Curated annotation (Swiss-Prot):
Its EC number is 3.1.21.10. This is Crossover junction endodeoxyribonuclease RuvC. Keywords: Cytoplasm, DNA damage, DNA recombination, DNA repair, DNA-binding, Endonuclease, Hydrolase, Magnesium, Metal-binding, Nuclease. The gene is ruvC. Disulfide bonds: none annotated. Its main location: cytoplasm. Binds 2 Mg(2+) ion per subunit.
Amino acid sequence: MSATVRILGIDPGSRVTGFGVIDVRGRDHFYVASGCIKTPADAPLADRIAVIVRHIGEVVTVYKPQQAAVEQVFVNVNPASTLMLGQARGAALAALVSHKLPVSEYTALQVKQAVVGKGKAAKEQVQHMVVQMLGLSGTPQPDAADGLAVALTHALRNHGLAAKLNPSGMQVKRGRFQ
């Protein structure tokens, strides 16, 4: 029987940070928990960052993941938004590393590709596939679904069939190794 690995996925945001916790046993994925960390929109940025760090620390303490995965920042049209997102992501990374968790990072494109099968998938498609893959009875909030999708991406890339068939870590694209 395969050992169980618990993975925490984080979708960082300065207003809402989504998280998802899954267990992976062999090729099977099991839902553990998910939720959203909401920060007060009118609070100073430093206070919002503190909320993110504190709540991610609580999630780690309660659910005891062995690995973590965080979605990378994409460059937005608005530089100020990109900077705020980067700071929220930094807070998430700091919280995870302070708990001695190994952290992997994935782009939004990689997450959508892993979960939906195409990198240009809509948020609703990601939510739908998260529900299907984890056998959920309801649809999680969008940010929580994104956190679960990040955790699933990590599981699929590191614990699933793809990792077993491709132990070198090389990417397969259009039938070729790159």
